[in-house]
Design a protein with these regions (language model features):
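Catalytic histidine-centered segment of alpha/beta-hydrolase-like enzymes
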Residues: 257-269
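Conserved hydrolase catalytic core segment
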Residues: 99-136
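Conserved alpha-helix/loop element of class I SAM-dependent methyltransferases that forms part
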Residues: 328-347
């Protein structure tokens, strides 16, 4: 996995002009996807196993947050400064247009902030099991103060306390627990899975605290942008409700899994979901022009009435001819199927769409 490291700097008066690295992979002629790691995660641990798969379809850009890159002497400042650096990179290198952004957990907050701020345009914003937690400044400060030394010790040792690991395995399963610990930095360090011992407590605190106190608006909407949420159902319904509260008409993709289990344990399926979200045909090009459509209540009501009355039914003389051709096709295909399979009286027939099951049922009766 070869990468070109690109340092980006922050525009504006926010006081942090230190470089942040973005690693690039693949052909620049392909649609660009920006990957954003989760809380206290190294970009290689978070996305190293899926970057080669993504390269077949995308020009891959992987963010390495300040304070979480072993090649840089830096500290994570806050969410808004890091967001400004990302926007600066997209403006300078991609003309302000980004095809897709995937945010793992905390990274989903960055996706939401960039869409909300409207300084650049993202065509497909994807949130990976992001919890989008927000809290009061004092309560969050106290929580961050308590959590920072624990997280710091865990990253420096590369181990989770035995009792905590056992509890995690009992709750979510050993395979998932191991995959998440590896992603988070709690496993043996290798060239592909760097040690996280270099991360300072200041960076941990700043990232944890600023993520929870940086406001994400409700009903975020930008024309030409579609938000996709990989919803891990086992996290609970409250997270689906948050996605629907913060974003107008998000594309909720349901997975009967734990937090980021799809990315951690099933990389091939995860890539397929990313491609499906971006409406790619597997060759790096969109199958159809992307259109954003928001319906009024009257339009939704009419759509429900139309749906109940079979909106696909052709009308008129041309429609009659179309139905005749469709029925002939069904008859030919199902006749071939029946020649291979002798249906018994107690067999169940699965309707796989377009009237195929109904045609099988009619022919089986004869």
């Amino acid at each position: 996995m070869q990468a070109a490291a690109i340092s980006v700097r922050c525009n504006g008066p926010m006081g942090d002009e230190k470089a942040m690295k973005i690693y690039s992979f693949g052909e620049e002629t392909k649609p660009a996807i920006l990957l954003l790691p989760g809380t206290c995660c190294h970009w290689k641990r978070n996305f190293g196993h899926v970057i080669p798969l993504l390269q077949e379809h995308f020009y891959v850009l992987c963010t390495s947050y300040d304070g979480f890159d072993e090649t840089e002497d830096s500290t994570f400042p806050n969410m808004l400064i890091e967001t400004a650096k990302l926007e600066n990179y997209i403006q300078k290198n991609l003309g302000g247009q980004l095809f897709a952004a995937y945010g793992c957990s905390l990274g989903g907050s960055f996706v939401g902030l960039m869409v909300q701020r409207k300084k650049i345009h993202i065509r497909h914003g994807i949130l990976g099991s992001s919890d989008l937690d927000q809290g009061s400044s004092f309560g969050t400060w106290a929580m961050a103060k308590a959590m920072t030394p624990l997280l710091g010790k865990m990253l420096r040792s590369g181990k989770l306390p035995v009792w905590a690991k056992k509890k995690m395995e009992e709750k979510a399963g050993a395979e998932y627990a191991q995959a998440m610990l590896q992603l988070f930095g709690c496993s043996a360090a290798t060239q592909e899975l760097p040690s996280m011992a270099f991360v300072s407590n200041t960076s941990i605190f700043n990232q944890f605290f600023s993520d929870m106190v940086t406001p994400l608006e409700d009903d975020i909407y930008v024309s030409g942008t579609k938000i996709h949420c990989f919803y891990a159902v086992k996290m609970g319904e409250e997270y689906e409700n948050r996605y629907r509260r913060h974003f107008v008409d998000p594309d909720i993709r349901y997975h009967a899994m734990q937090h980021e289990e799809l990315l951690a344990c099933y990389p091939e399926q995860w890539v397929e979901e990313v491609l499906a979200s971006c409406r790619l045909d597997g060759r790096g090009m969109e199958e159809n022009d992307f259109e954003e459509r928001h319906f009024t209540e009257a339009e939704r009501a009419q759509a429900e009435i139309t749906e109940s009355g079979n909106p696909r039914k052709p009308e008129g003389e041309d429609g009659k001819k179309m139905l005749e051709r469709m029925n002939e096709s069904h008859h030919n295909v199902t006749g071939w199927a029946l020649s291979l399979w002798e249906i018994q009286g107690n067999d169940n027939i699965l309707d796989i769409g377009c009237g195929g099951g109904a045609a099988l049922s009619r022919m089986a009766e004869h």
